[in-house]
From Swiss-Prot:
Keywords, in A-Z order: Calcium, Disulfide bond, Hemostasis impairing toxin, Hydrolase, Lipid degradation, Lipid metabolism, Metal-binding, Platelet aggregation inhibiting toxin, Secreted, Toxin
Cofactor note: Binds 1 Ca(2+) ion.
Active site: residue positions: H48
Pfam family, one: Phospholip_A2_1
Protein name: Phospholipase A2 superbin d
Catalytic activity of the protein: a 1,2-diacyl-sn-glycero-3-phosphocholine + H2O = a 1-acyl-sn-glycero-3-phosphocholine + a fatty acid + H(+)
Family assignment from sequence similarity: Belongs to the phospholipase A2 family. Group I subfamily.
């Protein structure tokens, strides 16, 4: 869910970027998703 996503992002980047910057990040972070993940963070979004 989006609350867990927000918590994961805050933990992973140590608060260096606001969570909202990732809502439309890569191919899988945010709503829906398709294609090839662009990096490890996007791959994590694909998995979860």
């Amino acid at each position: 869910n989006l609350v867990q996503f927000s918590n994961m992002i805050q933990c992973a980047n140590h608060g260096s970027r606001p969570t909202r910057h990732y809502v439309d990040y890569g191919c899988y972070c945010g709503w829906g998703g398709s294609g090839t993940p662009v990096d490890e963070l996007d791959r994590c979004c694909q998995t979860h």
